Amino acid sequence: MVEIKDSSNVRKLKEEFLRDFKRFDTVEDFSDHHYAAEGSPAKLSLWHLKFKGRPKNWVKDIQKEWKILDKNLPETIFVRACESRIDLLRAVIIGAEGTPYHDGLFFFDIQFPDTYPSVPPKVHYHSGGLRINPNLYKCGKVCLSLISTWTGKKREKWLPKESTMLQLLVSIQALILNEKPYYNEPGYEKSMGTPLGESYSKDYSENVFVFSLKTMHFEEFVRSHFFVRSHDIVKACNAYKDGAPVGSIDKGGVKKQTRQRGSLKFRINVTSFMKTVVDEFVNLGAIREANHRGEPNPTLFSCFFFCYLELIICSV
């Protein structure tokens, strides 16, 4: 069993840091931003923008967005803007409970185009080379009707006089990082509720959680987040190893009583990758490792061996 290290003072400091961490703030530099090289090579400061020929109210529109974000961001979304490049934003979204993304951190780089708000913002997802959602590509593309990268009804698309950056970020969290992302794939929603569809959905969600375990002006926030959430993540992994279905865990334990069980492949993947997760938490000073689960589960061990053997055979 993985135990939590008795470091109440450190944990308290981390919790206080997260509590005081501003949901919206400005930074001095965005040189590592995905869109940093786009636009004018000159710094897009408020002073420079007066001479760049952009729409008259472009600066005011962006400043208005800043104010909306500053006042209305939910507890699970954090945004950083840059005063020297006011066209750029960076956001981190915390995966919601009840989804395969729970406790994960998902980063997005955003740019206000020169013709904003007549056109929607550009959004790039930092995927780490992993496909964790039908709407989030490995290359960083985000498919969402609100930003015109996917089809949608009129009210689902960007409306220059109504749509906001806050709406965009909340939409990514609610519509993309949702409970059953499998059905985000076009056409798959027709199988929702059917035995085959639910089976595929469960497999997809299990893979999403494992990928999320593998994943910028938020460095201290990230360290503190995972320090504080380490107990919940380890508890979830232990429950998943025992067969709990993915997304059924909250801070109080298994919240959904169901006959469904996590697949054997999922349990094996979590068991295998948990060593890496635990090592990172140990390095972070959040936990100490006594034993992942006492004696190894013979069923899991034997199945893991045969899966590994099959992988070797297929690769020859």
Curated annotation (Swiss-Prot):
Source organism: Arabidopsis thaliana
Catalytic activity, reaction form: S-ubiquitinyl-[E1 ubiquitin-activating enzyme]-L-cysteine + [E2 ubiquitin-conjugating enzyme]-L-cysteine = [E1 ubiquitin-activating enzyme]-L-cysteine + S-ubiquitinyl-[E2 ubiquitin-conjugating enzyme]-L-cysteine
PANTHER family noted in UniProt: (E3-INDEPENDENT) E2 UBIQUITIN-CONJUGATING ENZYME, UBIQUITIN-CONJUGATING ENZYME E2 26-RELATED
Protein name: Putative ubiquitin-conjugating enzyme E2 39
Enzyme Commission number(s) from the entry: 2.3.2.23
CDD domains linked: UBCc_UBE2O
Location of the active site: C143 (glycyl thioester intermediate)
Domain UBC core positions: 57-217
Any one GO biological process: protein ubiquitination
Family, similarity comment: Belongs to the ubiquitin-conjugating enzyme family.
